[in-house]
UniProtKB/Swiss-Prot annotation:
Substrate binds at residues 126, 264. GO terms for biological process: arginine biosynthetic process via ornithine; L-arginine biosynthetic process; lysine biosynthetic process via aminoadipic acid. Its EC number is 2.6.1.118, 2.6.1.124. The modification N6-(pyridoxal phosphate)lysine is found at residue 236. Keywords: Amino-acid biosynthesis, Aminotransferase, Arginine biosynthesis, Cytoplasm, Lysine biosynthesis, Pyridoxal phosphate, Transferase. SUPFAM superfamilies: PLP-dependent transferases. Involved in both the arginine and lysine biosynthetic pathways. Its cofactor is pyridoxal 5'-phosphate. It comes from Sulfolobus acidocaldarius (strain ATCC 33909 / DSM 639 / JCM 8929 / NBRC 15157 / NCIMB 11770). This is [LysW]-aminoadipate semialdehyde/glutamate semialdehyde transaminase.
Length: 387
């Protein structure tokens, strides 16, 4: 029996994780800036999350949301402290792509419109609806026709927003485009986008699967822009490593949803609720958001200073602990070098090395990663010159 390999094989067998580190089968420790593409933001085997999951597993692990359970009440109280502004309702699902699907369906029902606006270079998932609003033709074209009509506008281009009209059901946007290269939205662009959706009666969906729950140095990345979306999707970090996603909705939208409008066999299971409850408690108890903000600024400053003289480095960008190092060639060799030296990172776009560390990283971790990255870039640069 073989597992279908849908992601590139890194050639490592990982057997354990703890805080900001993982260990391979030979006992070697790695500094984890991959974190399951941003999932383990709260650290591997976080003790609070472990405790909640163990306790819930000993009681009941699966239950339809037709039934109530004590962990649901505790989760709702915990979520109430971290919820996006004006969003008092949550729908629990299992993955980021499912949350996007639910958000798109909700927008169509609420507005009675069909057209969806997304942005070039966006990534929202690989199921039919979310794939329809994902830009990369490599992912999308083999499976067309998909859900439509969808129109892609140019990210950070205010003039292009004129194409949002009274037939638009929703505009879906990542505050920082992650998969395409860690590209933050401009403040002016986001404010213009919010104004345009309000004027046309379109719903503004923020896909915060990767940016949300403290990763960018704000609890939610929309807070960088002083606007509030109509719908927000969260995932990855919000489960502390457990597969769960959340769609947050305000009352005026949630109250129009009816039984059967959406559903999920596993969505909102007691284990997922326990994970979300625990993750919310970690965020509050450990002052995670402020740590991500301070450490993110510190790490970016270290990288900028250490890489400033390298011609192969175009830019260091991002927010908080979502950092991209844009280089002048494909990053495969650099990622391999980092891994050989005990640091796991991930590619973004065609030329970006993406660092998505846990909030638990230390100054020493930052220095080590920056120095190893510099060594790797110099080694590859010198090799290219000599050849």
């Amino acid at each position: 029996m073989k597992l279908i390999q849908l992601y590139g094989d890194r050639g490592l067998t990982i057997v354990k994780g703890e805080a900001q580190y993982v260990w391979d089968i030979e006992g070697r420790r790695y500094l984890d800036f991959h974190t399951g593409i941003g999932v383990a933001f709260l650290g591997h085997r976080n003790p609070i999350i472990l405790e909640y999951l163990k306790n819930q597993l000993e009681n009941i692990s699966i239950l339809s949301t037709s039934f109530s359970t004590p962990i649901k009440d505790e989760m709702l109280q915990a979520l109430d402290k971290v919820k996006p502004d004006k969003m008092d309702n949550a729908m629990l699902l299992n993955s980021g792509t499912e949350a996007v699907e639910a958000a798109l369906k909700t927008a169509r029902k609420i507005t009675g419109r069909k057209k969806i606006i997304a942005f070039k270079n966006a990534f929202h998932g690989r199921t039919a609806g979310s794939l329809s609003v994902t830009w990369n033709k490599k992912y999308r074209e083999p499976f067309e026709p998909l859900v439509g009509p969808v129109e892609f506008l140019t990210f950070n281009n205010i003039e292009d927003l004129s194409k949002i009209d009274n037939e638009t059901a929703a505009v879906i946007v990542e505050p920082i485009q992650g998969e395409s290269g860690v590209i933050p939205a401009n403040i002016e662009f986001m404010k213009a986008l919010k104004e345009k959706t309000e004027n046309t009666g379109s719903l503004l969906i923020f896909d915060e699967i990767q940016t949300g729950f403290g990763r960018t140095g704000k609890l939610w990345a929309y807070k960088h822009y002083n606007i509030v979306p109509d719908i927000l999707t969260a995932g990855k970090a919000i489960g502390g490593g457990f597969p769960v996603s959340v769609v947050f909705l305000p009352d005026h939208i949630a109250n129009k949803l009816e039984e059967g409008d959406h559903g999920s066999t596993y969505g909102g299971n007691p284990m997922a609720m326990a994970a979300v409850t625990a993750a919310c408690k970690v965020i509050e108890k450990e002052n995670v958001v402020e740590q991500a903000n301070q450490k993110g600024q510190q790490f970016s400053n270290i990288l900028v200073k250490n890489l400033a003289d390298l011609k192969v480095v175009r830019e260091v960008r991002g927010k908080g602990l979502m950092i991209g190092i844009d280089i002048r060639f494909q990053p495969g060799q650099v990622l391999k070098y980092l891994q050989e030296k005990g640091i796991l990172a991930v590619k973004a776009g065609s030329t970006v090395i993406r660092f998505l560390p846990s909030y638990l990283i230390t100054y020493e971790n930052m220095e080590e990663a920056s120095n190893v990255l510099r060594e790797g870039l110099l080694k590859i640069e010198n090799k290219a010159v000599s050849s």
